[in-house]
Amino acid sequence: LRMTLKKFGLWLGVVGFVAMLSLPAPEGLSDTGWRVAAVTVLIGCWWFTEAVPVTLTGSLPFLTLPLLGIAKPDAIASLYMSPVLFLILGGSLIGLAFEKWNLHRRVALMVVSKANPEPRSLLLAIMAVTAFVSMWVNNSATTVMMLPIAMAALAAVVPEEGTKVDASLQRHHRNFAAAMILAVSLASNLGGFATPIGTPVNSIAVGILERSYEVRLSFIEWMSFGVPFMLLSVPVAWWILSRVTLPFDFAGASRESIRDSIGEPGPIGVAERRVLAIVAIVAAAWVFLPVLEKTIPGLTDAGIAVAGALAL
């Protein structure tokens, strides 16, 4: 089925591309705009179906746009070397360092193991730590990492399947389980909005603003509205989940049972300390960039990200 979908996407993209180039541009759209639309259809079909490797699809604009007379090769190449891409690259490498040494898991275990074991408080703790980790690590990776921790905490609070409980309590347990899973997904997205590197979409938005409207948003300027949004939206999402969408109300487990269920993070190693130190320096440099620029002209968010990645 997957191979069939890939072949379908491959030929759908090619046929759509050729057909659009063979037809005149619709009224109100320039010939150049119509050719750009044809390239977009080709790339979209190949991207969504993964008809060819994603890296190859991403390189198509460099080939097709100059051939169709839409833009010159040097103009296209300059976009592939955009500072925003280096911000994404540096931020991604920092996130990978977190993942390699399980620092995100360590933070999560420390917070959740010390959280109030009452179900609603536990749900809020899971959401808070997920949102924090997602500020620095890719949303998908954060979700994959946090779900097992959330499920382990859930297992300590909710009795095993088959345990005899009354129907009302069973409904509360079921709602809590569903809320816990949804909470991780929601918090990952909300936390990802807090920083420019929280999700690639943020960095792309920064690049578009700078290139198209000459509006430059620094790391700290993005955080000035991204962090307050996260701090407001996470509690609101928690309240809606636990009180409206999937209400639950029952006694929780002891803090010891939750700690036993999710496990202990263990002693911190030398490599983890080094990664934490580098990340702390990078984060501080992003925050104090306006001050650092006076001493180090030309320093940018992307430069800081790359320097941090090289140090790792």
Enumerate the language-model features and the residues they cover:
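Membrane-core helix-loop-helix motifs of multi-pass transport proteins
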Residues: 161-247
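Peri-membrane helix termini and adjoining interfacial loops of integral membrane proteins
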Residues: 102, 107, 157-164, 202-209, ...
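Transmembrane alpha-helix interface/packing and boundary motifs in multi-pass membrane proteins
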Residues: 44-53, 129-138, 185-196
